Amino acid sequence: MSDESLLIDAAARLFGDLAAKRDAGFADLWGPVAEAGFPLLLVPEADGGFGGSWQDAFAVLRLAGYHALACPVGEAIIAAWLLNAAGLAQPEGLATIAPRIDGKLSDGRFTGSVAGVPWGGEATAILAVLDGQLIVLTGADAERIDPHENPADESRDTLHFTDAAVAQAACSADLTALGALIRTAQIAGAMDAALAQSIAYANEREQFGKPIGKFQALQQNLAVFAEEAAAVNCAGHAAFAAAGKYGGAAEFEVAAAKLRANIAIGIGTSTAHQVHGAIGFTREYSLNPLTRRLWSWRSEFGNDRYWSQILGRQVVAAGADAFWPTLTSRSDP
């Protein structure tokens, strides 16, 4: 068995086991993930990491989405990669990333706030980019933490700091784009899981003397759902491959992937709930954590409008004659 197969098998087993613990606290979920070394997936082996590729990251994060894993494995993977690239030390506990930052950095100290931070209240370190600098805030230094959750009950906290000491290094990374990669992979997995559940339910639920999956109209809707799920997976694979090849210059592929994933969510979740009916909306039912996450992730790290504008500007900038050659030259990175 290859290293990639071993990685995927380990992630599938661990995430599946953790997903079954619906009432488990954060520490009970995060502890096994951290102990298994998943946060260090993109850190080179020479620096104590797994030495995985961006495609490995896609596979792991897709499985996190498939199992609706309630902890920030993607954010931790990106945080560890950023810290390693910047030559900064890895923290002992959870390191996460801040989608939004508002404040001032002066002489190695930060005053302001970071918002929408995945599990920010649980984090040892919070990474953000401000004025071309990667800054690492210590969670314990927060003057105040305002706990918030997205519609899927995932922690999205706001932390306030006053004259807090930070570690920092020059950084050109776009945290919105990196976060969009995380969400695209998670969306791909959650779409696949919701599709599988919808097909299984359609083959079990009977109306008018036969399984509802035998009705042509429903079969057509599920076929469209399958197309959307496949499109998200293809776009996600391409974006992660481009990130591995082009680094920060992969914005076009990231924008296309996150936008494609966002669009697919509306189609896929509508079909899933049409198939399941009322039971699909109950919190106890396994479809519920998937679709609530999909609706939440659609607006995180860039909504439809944000990534549409990014794509539009790049198309216009390339010009009519150069756009197609540019696009095809970057295909299948």
Predicted regions and their residues:
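Alpha-helical interface subdomain recognition
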Residues: 1-67, 181-333
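FAD-binding core of flavoproteins
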Residues: 68-74, 81, 87-196, 325-333
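Short beta->alpha linker loops
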Residues: 74-77, 217
